[in-house]
Amino acid sequence: MVKDFSFFIYDYESFGVNPATDRPAQFAGIRTDADFNIIGEPIMFYCKQTNDYLPAPEAVMVTGITPQECNEKGLSEPEFAANILAEFSQPNTCVMGYNNIRYDDEMTRYTFYRNFIEPYEYSWKNGNSRWDLLDLVRACYALRPEGINWAYDDDGMPSFRLEKLTKANSIEHENAHDAMADVYATIAMAKLIKEKQPKLFQYFFENRGKKEIEKLVDTGAMTPLVHVSGMLGNYRGNCTWVAPLAWHPTNQNALIVCDLTGDIDNLLAKSADELRADLYTKKLELEERGVSSVPLKLVHINKCPILAPAKTLLPETANRLGIDRQLCLDNLAKLRASFDIREKVADIFNEERQFASNDNVETELYNGFFSNADKNNMAILRSLPAEKLSEHGLAFEDKRILELLFHYRARHFYKTLTRAEQIKWKKYRQNKLEKSAVEFEASLQRLVEXHSDNSEKLSLLQQVYEYGIKLLG
C-alpha cells in the first residue's frame, strides 16, 4: 500500500432514489487512514435545489431534510460538485461508502456530468480507486461471519441495513439517514470487519480492481468462483458458486457467469431467443408459468464485485447457507460437456434491448465518453464567469454539451439568458414540473394519511407541499 493512501468515506442524502433524475440534498465525508483512523476534519454541506425539480416527499420523510433547508444553508450545485471533487481527487484516495457503487457513486457521476466535471476520473486517476463496504459486509456474513453480531429481519433473513447492523454491534448511530451519522457508522463497521476478519478484508481490498479480478477469471476452463451479490438473495447469504462462461459481446467490463445452483438442463435445452425472453421476464411471472429462472448473471468487473476462488466456500459454510456443492459440481460438468454454451450465452446478450426513447440530455451520461478535447473545453467552461458562458467560442464534438450548458446557465445564471432562451427554459421547466406534479401530489396525499397522528412528519409534509406549490405556480 502506498505511503499516503487514505480512505474517503462518504454518503449522500438525496431527494429521490434515481441518481439520474433526482438531486443530492446533503453530502458528508471523512478521510481516514488505512486502518480507518480519522485523519481529516469532517466535511458536510447541503446542495441548493433548482427551480425545475420537485423533490420526492418520501425522501423528506426518511431524511428530515427539506428543500427549504437546502436552499437556506446550501451551496449552488456547481459549488457543491466542485467541493466534492476537491476531496475525491486527492492522490491515492479510495472513495468508499455503504452501497455507494450502486447509488452514491452514481449520484456523484450525474452531478459531475451536469456541472462539466469529468465523471469517472476521480475514481482511477492519480492512484485513486473506489470500494463498497456493503458488499464486503455481505461477503463477511456469507464466508467468514465469526466476530460480528448479525442483524435479522422478522422473517429470519439477514438484514444488511446499516442502522440494524450498528445496533446489533453496539455502534453509536443516532440520526440514521443523516449523511454524517451514516459516515461515522460506515467507518465503525469497516473497522470492525478489518479487526475481526483481517484476512477476508485484505483479500477483497486487494482484489477490488478490474486487473485483479481479470486474473481470477478463466472462461476457457470455466474455473468456478465464489460470488457474493445482493442480486442472489438473502436466503442463501447472497452467495453462490458461479462458472464464468464468456465475456459480454459488447461490454468489455461485463462477465457472463452461470449460477451453478440453477437449472442447467433448462439452460442447455432452450434456444438463445427463448432464454433471452425468459431472462427479461419477472421471476413471479416465470413461476406462474412453471418456468425456472435463467441461471445467468452479468458480473461487472469495474464495480468491485465480490469474487474469490471456489475453495473459499468451505463445506460447512455451504451447508449453513444451503448451497449444495455436489449439485454445483454436477452442473459444472454439464456446462463443460456442452459444445455450444459459450456461443449461446454470448448470443443471448448480443441483441441490444430496445429502451424507450429519451429526450432528457441529463440522463444520457452513459451515451458515450467525452473526448479529451471536449473534457479540456468543459474545464474552460467551468472557469468562465457567468456573463462569458454565452460567448465561450468553444467547439464541442459531443452534441450533449451545448444542451447541458443551456440547462446550466438557466439554472444558475438565469439573467445571462436571452429573451428567446428564457422562453425556451420556461417551456422546458413547465413541462418537466407538470410531468412530476401528479406523482408528487399523490405521494403527499398518501403520506399525510399515513402520518395523520405524527405532528413532526405532518410539519415536514406541509413544508414540502408549500415548496411544491410555489414551484408549480
Curated annotation (Swiss-Prot):
Gene3D superfamilies according to UniProt: 1.10.287.1240, Exonuclease ExoI, domain 2, Exonuclease ExoI, domain 3, Ribonuclease H-like superfamily/Ribonuclease H
Residue ranges constituting the ExoI SH3-like domain according to the UniProt record: 198-353
Cofactor note: Binds 2 Mg(2+) ions per monomer.
Record EC number: 3.1.11.1
GO BP of this protein: DNA catabolic process; DNA repair
Covalent S-S links between cysteines: none
Key words of the record: DNA damage, DNA repair, DNA-binding, Exonuclease, Hydrolase, Magnesium, Metal-binding, Nuclease
Binding site for substrate: E13
Cited InterPro entries: Exodeoxyribonuclease_I, EXOI_C, EXOI_SH3, EXOI_SH3_sf, Exonuc_1_C, Exonuclease_RNaseT/DNA_pol3, Oligoribonuclease, RNaseH-like_sf
Oligomer status and interactors: Monomer. Interacts with ssb (via C-terminus); this interaction stimulates the exonuclease activity by recruiting the enzyme to its substrate.
Reported function: Degrades single-stranded DNA (ssDNA) in a highly processive manner. Also functions as a DNA deoxyribophosphodiesterase that releases deoxyribose-phosphate moieties following the cleavage of DNA at an apurinic/apyrimidinic (AP) site by either an AP endonuclease or AP lyase. Involved in genome maintenance but probably not in phase variation, which contributes to the virulence and disease.
Protein name in UniProt: Exodeoxyribonuclease I
